Every structure is written in C-alpha cells, then in structure tokens.
Amino acid sequence: MNWNLVFDGLIGYLCLLILLTFHEAAHAWTAWKCGDDTAYQEGRVSLNPVVHMDMLGTVILPLAVVLLGAAGSGMGRFIIGWGKPVPVYLGNLRKPRLQDTLIAVAGPAMNLILAVALMFLARVFVSAEMSQMAYVVVRMSQISLLLCFFNLLPIPPLDGSHVLKNFIGMSDETYIRISQFGFIIVIVLIQLQLVSAIINYSTRLTFMMIERLVGLPLVGMA
C-alpha cells in the first residue's frame, strides 16, 4: 500500500464530495425553479454534503477506487461517483419533457462551470507562486469535468439517460424497469476500454480548451 497515493486519493475524494454537492444542488434548485418543490421540501436545495450522499456512489465506490489506486491498480487518479438522486415529480412540471431535460442537464452544466471557475482560481494561485494549491485546484477541475461527462452517459439513472428518455419519448414504466439495473450496468460499462476512453478523451479535450481560455499552460492530464 502506497500511503502517499492514499493521501493523494483522499484529497481527490474531498474534491469529489464538494463537486457532487454542487452537482446535486443544481438539480434540486433547477427542479424547484421549474415548479417542482419535492427536492426543496426534502432539504436538497442545499450545499450540505450530507443531504446529497449516496452510500454506494458517494462513499463505497469512490473510497474503493482510492484504495485500489494506492494498491497499484492505477485507478486512483480518475475518481468518480454519484450523489443521491434528486427526486422529481413530473406532475408538478408545466412542460414535463423539456423541464425534466433541463433539470437533468443542470448537474453536468454546474460541473462544467465549476471546472472553468477552478481554472481561473488556479491561475491566481500560480501568480501567487502557490504551486501546491494550484495543483489541488487543477485536479479538482479535472475531476469536475470527469463528473460532467460521466453523468452524461445515457444509462439510467445518470443524467444523460433523462435527456435520451425525453428525446425518444420513452415511457416512464420502461425507464423505471431499466433503472432497476442501471448502476450495475454503469459499473460494468466504465470498466470497458471504449467507454472509459470516450469519457477520458472528452475530459482531456475540454480541459485543454479551458486551459487556452484561462491562459494557463499547466500540465494536462497524464
């Protein structure tokens, strides 16, 4: 066990926890503004990480990735996870398909916004010659982009599946049936080289674009 990698992985986990909190809060806030106060009544329009935590997606899987990475599997650098799904009652929405899509996209959009904001913050740290802080913030930006593209996978109950469901007009009954096995499918698919390559390529490309936007020629993802 490499304890330096454990420490590095735990920093990544704390970054993930913060990013997931903003991600889920964005879903809840958007649902509230679209007319469904279900998540609001459950206290999900909040930046308190505890209310958004999912035992498997926020605790078990990410920490397992940290430990496996420290044991030499090479997994620890690209830590991913998910929060507790935000409840949305479509009957409260004025335009269910459109607004459900907006609610779904809000999470990944928040991650993209955070990735850009964090890179601007990294530029401040670089100017102040605070290289360690710059490294942490850049890594947090990378994790935010990973979360963005991971959640856009069209597999229930990830955000991309809501976009696909509303685009093709899938029935709620069919979606619910598929969702019962969704996270099993997700865990299997992210082990496939093609799927991980698509996520990593999208993340790298977007990260390089943000680097150019910010004007911060840092070392990209290795």
Regions found by a protein language model. Give the residues of each.
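Hydrophobic transmembrane alpha-helices and their immediate loop junctions
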Residues: M1-A222
